[in-house]
Amino acid sequence: MADYTRQRIFFVDDEVTVRRVVSRTLERLGAKVSCFARARYCLERLRSKRCDLLITDVKMPGMTGIELLTEAKRVAPWLPVLVITGYGDVPMAVRALKAGALDFIEKPLDRKRFLSVVEAALQRSAPIDRLLGKALTRMEIAMLCLLLEGKSNREIAQLLHRSIRTIESHRSRTMRKLGVTNVVDLVRRAAALGLTELPTPQTLKTQR
């Protein structure tokens, strides 16, 4: 079973009963759970607080779970996100996965299935803790994640709403902190820490 004791989980659902059940289940395992009745409240917290896993319902008043997922990925590209869909709602599940969700969970929630998916998602956030241990900032981790997706400095700057010069500065500091001198070694170092699979040589050659 995963170690929940250091995990910070954000859970979004407009049904108070569901929020209570989920928060109690995860808190009994040691996780620190923050619950939100509206997606926009969660998004505000994401911009200023650490989150290791985001779990959100899809159909809610105001901002939907898919919209929250999209915005959350802009704030924290590395963040694993799980979405909760109605039973048999395949089109919605597909939309969520295309938007960047790691997995989906169907209602009504089955405890065994729910915890299995949550544990798998938390394993994805473990490399981030290791990178934070290397004193990387959240912005540097976001830049690194996008770099490992094959994004150029210009694309990263646009996605993170920063100047190209700022992104270049983040990349230089990240390389220095991880003890590497080029992009190829940076990718290898990140992979060794468990952040990502190594991209293809063609991807590395196109980095600018």
Language-model region placement:
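Receiver (REC) domain active-site loop signature in two-component systems and cognate sites
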Residues: 60
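Conserved acidic segment of CheY-like receiver
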Residues: 3-18, 22-26, 54
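Acidic catalytic/metal-coordinating carboxylates
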Residues: 37-38, 64-67
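Basic, Lys/Arg-enriched C-terminal extension of HTH/homeodomain DNA-binding domains
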Residues: 175-208
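C-terminal output helix
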Residues: 89-91, 105-118, 159
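Acidic, metal-coordinating helix/loop segments flanking the phosphotransfer/catalytic sites
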Residues: 35-53, 74
